[in-house]
Amino acid sequence: MARFGTQKLYIDGAYVDAGSDATFEAINPATGEVLAHVQRATEADVEKAVESAERGQKVWAAMTAMQRSRILRRAVDILRERNDELAMLETLDTGKSYSETRYVDIVTGADVLEYYAGLVPAIEGEQIPLRESSFVYTRREPLGVTVGIGAWNYPIQIALWKSAPALAAGNAMIFKPSEVTSLTTLKLAEIYTEAGLPNGVFNVLTGSGREVGTWLTEHPRIEKVSFTGGTTTGKKVMASASSSSLKEVTMELGGKSPLIICADADLDKAADIAMMANFYSSGQVCTNGTRVFIPAEMKAAFEAKIAERVARIRVGNPEDENTNFGPLVSFQHMESVLGYIAKGKEEGARVLCGGERLTAGDFAKGAFVAPTVFTDCTDDMTIVKEEIFGPVMSILTYETEEEVIRRANDTDYGLAAGVCTNDITRAHRIIHKLEAGICWINAWGESPAEMPVGGYKQSGVGRENGVSSLAQYTRIKSVQVELGGYNSVF
């Protein structure tokens, strides 16, 4: 018997059975335990969710800005009241350490919802004078029914990042969580209903991206799709979204981000930043700075500091708050990461730390991979070029600023980048030349609600968070008003 039984779909403000008996398993990657049997949505369920969302969206959009704001703020309050419960469920489902989910995942997701709840009354149009007797005004109107498709690494946080601006602008959202980690998004749907969100304004459909995701993105009455995931899948989603209608799209995709450490940097601080850029959340963060560039003359000292810090990582049961490094999200993903590690060894990179699956004692039950650091890396190695999405750092050396900027930009990705230096002029000079959408100077990883998040090149389209994201969930209607006479040319 699974701990959480059978998980149903969430449509029109309630849990409902899917149109078929098909289910998939939610598995705890730390132990292999089956947590739940999750129902697979059918195409008929998708249609039911769209119809429900259309009804709910009309009710939601007709409310005043202050009414919508109050409901979203109530959802924030409930999220914070249930923080620990939701965090533990996220830990069980993803394998992320409770020390992380308790203080980050729900907390930061609630912050984003609170941020957009505060912006609801600020959605406004413009008045543009033309001449004494005529002017134009604009209205920002909601799109209608939107779709969010989440990744498996930050399930509830991503659902909040996508739903917060969508709902704030008066839209409805149908959300499809990753098949790997579906549980907390269903709880979010409950919370929205409890807070007073009209039925149908936030529906959750569980199932595979190939089926449920495609049915949603190809649906002609969906107005926007916001997707987080890999670049290859993102391209398919974009093509699918335009196959039946011209939909708005936001894509937050993959990365192979550079962290450049300059010769004048505080090496201890740089090592701390490199650790956060590679091993936070067991390395499963899209913005990770996995290509660490260090001046050649500083390499040995930097390696020593990294090895010392890796030895202090507390790998263990993610339910234990003392643990700060848990398993990977699934056994399938573990095999993918181990394949990259094997490739790194085969291509001549030197293993400084880790480089193996952990199998001692209870580790054997889970998808645990040791924090891994490769050094003596070159730009043409597979581990340097491809996104691994795991706890694998690659150390590379460089000689000049011009060289490292060129090499940092020599990638199809452009999600994030960082610079460590005590020279603020150099910091800005380098950052301004890096082809990345999210950049940090002497820091890594923080993405507050106010900060637009998104990539260059094949790392994404559009932005999440920040004021500009709210506008992406509206469309502008322009209205010209003539107060005087009208002269026809006929």
UniProtKB/Swiss-Prot annotation:
Its EC number is 1.2.1.8. The modification Cysteine sulfenic acid (-SOH) is found at residue 286. InterPro entries: Ald_DH/histidinol_DH, Ald_DH_C, Ald_DH_CS_CYS, Ald_DH_CS_GLU, Ald_DH_N, Aldehyde_DH_dom, BADH. It catalyses: betaine aldehyde + NAD(+) + H2O = glycine betaine + NADH + 2 H(+). One of its GO terms (biological process) is glycine betaine biosynthetic process from choline. The record marks 248 as: Seems to be a necessary countercharge to the potassium cations. It is an enzyme of class 1 (oxidoreductase). Belongs to the aldehyde dehydrogenase family. This is Betaine aldehyde dehydrogenase. The gene is betB.
